[in-house]
């Protein structure tokens, strides 16, 4: 593997000194880029794009050609794990992801097998190794997975949900059944992420997109508990370096202290949290990633500049901050505005690292 030339992102996650705040964007390889749309059209559909290692590599690299970013993130989907469990993932226009065979009974959950990441998920591993090779050490590669709770919401509901009625019914009516599912998912995700590291991922992120839908105590029982299990089982060193782990619960501002106790290296923040307040609460334990509202990218370059300045000022001096959006970039954002965002981070952050 080529020697890493830019380790700013990894250093910030480990709270080591950096010359400026590193920056990347969630969903940086995505529909806001015309070159992504062209490659997706070539693939035919979303999952065909994910399953073609060369095209997955191409879309991973596309934002790096446009912008001076400090990390690449594997192009894939959080639902690859349940798909590999045999649920029959498909995408319905205007409806998002759906499963042909939801796991909404104890019998269906008992039948689930833990997928072999080098077999049923081998296409992801081939993409990881291809991307790592083609990056040529320019920036580190982030591997990722959905959290057990978030994956379970799709599996039990049969797809996207706003009310989470089925899975919450299971949580309170048949908690042992849900725990059985979450336990299998935690084991599956641990194997999946460790295989990503073995194939070249240099940092890991767990996306808990729907943890914020839970009550205070239910979050600890059904989400955090299983992310903790994963963190405990992850490979934390590879290629002579530490492999940092970031946890991101959308809507998780209430639980930063509990999340920081898991032993992860960093927490992702959504835009509802003041990053300076988050630093005062947990900055002694973990680095922080975030957290500009993605909708700010619809604003003028001047407004974007102002928002970046405010977040940097709130965090203050020193390392331990990776600049990002508070969630994925919207598909209708002008790529020029994303460029304004990244340039503003470069321009404004150096003074906080002298």
Curated annotation (Swiss-Prot):
Pathway the protein contributes to: Porphyrin-containing compound metabolism; protoporphyrin-IX biosynthesis; coproporphyrinogen-III from 5-aminolevulinate: step 4/4
Sites annotated Transition state stabilizer: 77
Residue sites binding substrate per the record: 27-31, 77, 154, 209, 327
Keywords: Cytoplasm, Decarboxylase, Lyase, Porphyrin biosynthesis
Sample GO molecular function, one term: uroporphyrinogen decarboxylase activity
Gene Ontology cellular component annotations, sorted alphabetically: cytosol
Broad enzyme group: lyase
Coiled-coil ranges per UniProt: none
Subunit-structure text: Homodimer.
HAMAP family membership: URO_D
PANTHER family in UniProt: METHYLTETRAHYDROFOLATE:HOMOCYSTEINE METHYLTRANSFERASE RELATED, UROPORPHYRINOGEN DECARBOXYLASE
Protein name in UniProt: Uroporphyrinogen decarboxylase
Organism: Shewanella halifaxensis (strain HAW-EB4)
């Amino acid at each position: 593997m080529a020697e890493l030339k830019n380790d700013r992102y990894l250093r910030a996650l480990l709270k080591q000194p950096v010359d400026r705040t590193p920056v990347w964007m969630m969903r940086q390889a995505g529909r806001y880029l015309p070159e992504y749309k062209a490659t997706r059209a070539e693939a035919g559909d979303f999952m065909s794009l994910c399953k073609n290692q060369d095209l997955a590599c191409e879309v991973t690299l596309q934002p790096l050609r446009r912008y001076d970013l400090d990390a690449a993130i594997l192009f894939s989907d959080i639902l690859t794990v349940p798909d590999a469990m045999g649920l029959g993932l498909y995408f319905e226009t205007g409806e998002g992801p759906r499963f042909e065979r939801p796991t909404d009974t104890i019998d269906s959950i008992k039948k689930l097998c833990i997928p072999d990441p080098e077999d049923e998920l081998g296409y992801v591993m081939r993409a990881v190794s291809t991307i790592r090779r083609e990056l040529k050490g320019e920036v580190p590669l982030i591997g990722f997975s959905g959290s057990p709770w978030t994956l379970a919401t799709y599996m039990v509901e049969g797809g996207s949900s706003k009310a989470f009625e089925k899975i919450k019914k299971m949580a309170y009516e048949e908690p042992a059944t849900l725990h059985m599912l979450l336990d299998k998912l935690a084991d599956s995700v641990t194997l999946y992420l460790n295989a990503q590291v073995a194939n070249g991922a240099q940092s890991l992120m767990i996306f808990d997109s729907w943890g914020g839908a839970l009550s205070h105590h239910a979050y600890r029982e059904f989400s955090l508990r299983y992310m903790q299990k994963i963190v405990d089982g992850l490979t934390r060193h590879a290629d002579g370096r530490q492999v940092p782990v970031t946890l991101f619960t959308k809507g998780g501002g209430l639980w930063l202290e509990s999340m920081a106790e898991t032993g992860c290296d960093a927490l992702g923040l959504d835009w509802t949290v003041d990053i300076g307040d988050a630093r005062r609460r947990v900055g002694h334990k973990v680095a922080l990633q975030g957290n500009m509202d993605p909708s700010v990218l619809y604003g003028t370059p001047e407004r974007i500049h102002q928002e970046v300045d405010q977040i940097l000022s709130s965090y203050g001096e020193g390392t331990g901050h990776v600049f990002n959006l508070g969630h994925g970039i919207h598909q209708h954002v002008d790529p020029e505005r994303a460029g304004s965002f990244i340039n503003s981070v470069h321009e404004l952050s150096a003074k906080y690292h002298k």
